[in-house]
Design a protein with these regions (language model features):
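Hydrophobic residues within beta-strands of alpha/beta enzymes
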Residues: 66-68
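Conserved alpha/beta catalytic core and glycan-binding cleft of carbohydrate-active enzymes
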Residues: 1-9, 105-167
Length: 167
């Protein structure tokens, strides 16, 4: 409304905002990473259908597994609310994007299960409970990278806390 970016989200790996003005359209587009990597609008049914078609294309050619990058960022806050003040400047991709993301993961899982394929997700969230939320119920990711474990000191007591936190 004021002619600037829709919110204060920051891009990862860069001091730049996660919004870039497209000169031709006069509109901003979202990229949680590089400006050359625009985010897809997973709220758009045509985008979802196209992405499912991509999966089916590769499955028909014998691919039986996929690695999904930054899957915790698929769904976005429909309000595009600002990051809280205490998180301003941190990459927006560090937030958990919530229900829309989990709904999309369930739809992808159904498609892959029907075809006998699987998906491992890169979920760069920094707590085990949030990471585990992408696995619970057996209807989202088949496997997920455990990034919280990468940041855990190599001490038995800390690992116990990390593992028990994934209940």
């Amino acid at each position: 409304p004021d002619g600037g970016p829709p919110n204060n989200w920051a891009a990862a790996f860069s001091p730049e905002p996660s919004w870039t003005l497209d000169q031709r359209s006069g509109q901003y587009y979202l990229h949680l990473f590089l400006a050359q990597q625009p985010d897809l609008d997973w709220n758009n049914p045509r985008v979802v259908a196209a992405m499912h078609a991509v999966l089916e294309f590769w499955i028909e050619r014998g691919v039986d597994g996929f690695r999904a990058d930054v899957v915790h960022c698929i769904g976005k806050d429909p309000e595009l609310a600002d990051m809280p003040e205490d998180l301003v400047g941190l990459p927006a991709m560090l937030q958990d994007f919530g229900p829309g993301t989990h709904d999309q993961q369930r739809a992808i899982r159904r498609l892959l299960d029907d075809k006998g394929s699987m998906v491992v997700g890169e979920t760069y969230v920094l707590d085990t409970t949030t990471m585990a939320s992408y696995l619970e119920g057996g209807d989202q990711l088949h496997l997920a990278f455990n990034f919280p474990a990468l940041h855990c000191p190599w001490e038995a007591a800390r690992w116990r806390v990390e593992i028990e936190g994934a209940n």
